[in-house]
Design a protein with these regions (language model features):
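Cyclophilin-like peptidyl-prolyl cis-trans isomerases
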Residues: 1-170
């Protein structure tokens, strides 16, 4: 990714993470994430799903575990050549390939089974749009937080991991 690529700072309750967007290969996903950052949408949201050795997911629930209303779903860009490698961010979605909105996840390891393999229901994969360039130690610390069930959700941190503020770095 180029040195002029947009960077976003996520100030969390466990420390700071800086990510660099790849607007060249993932223009829709990067623009979508940036829109939510600029609107302040992620401020006060939590990382609600932590699976050590796999990924940590956030961007959709507030500290009361209420799901936030989102904008329109976006087209899946997982066929962009970017891979779900350790430290990359990808758009979370439902089983429907083109259902991503605000939620994203950070890969703890190379998760090649999440990569694009074909334009069919099982092959679309998950669109990578950014990578952690600072604070991977913070992401790794999230994996050490005890988790449990909350409502119908599993792997939820017992203590909220909050995105206190998301800022575009100029």
């Amino acid at each position: 990714m180029s040195a002029t690529a947009t960077q976003v700072k996520l100030t969390t309750s466990l420390g700071t993470i800086v990510v660099q967007l790849n607007s060249e290969k993932a223009p829709l996903s990067a623009a979508n994430f940036l829109k939510y950052v600029k609107e302040g949408f992620y401020n006060g949201t939590i990382f609600h799903r932590v699976i050590p050795g796999f990924m940590v997911q956030g961007g959709g629930f507030d500290t009361n575990f209420e799901q936030k209303a989102t904008g329109a779903e976006i087209q899946n860009e997982a066929d962009n050549g970017l891979k779900n490698k350790r430290g990359t961010l990808a758009m979370a979605r439902t089983n429907a390939p083109h259902s991503a909105s605000s939620q994203f996840f950070i890969n703890y390891k190379d998760n090649s089974f999440l990569d694009f393999s074909g334009k069919n229901a099982s092959g679309w994969g998950y669109a990578v749009f950014a990578e952690v360039i600072e604070g991977m130690d913070v992401v790794d610390a999230m994996a050490k937080v005890p988790t449990g069930n909350r409502g119908h959700h599993g792997d939820v941190p017992k203590t909220n991991i909050v995105i206190e503020k998301a800022d575009v770095l100029e």
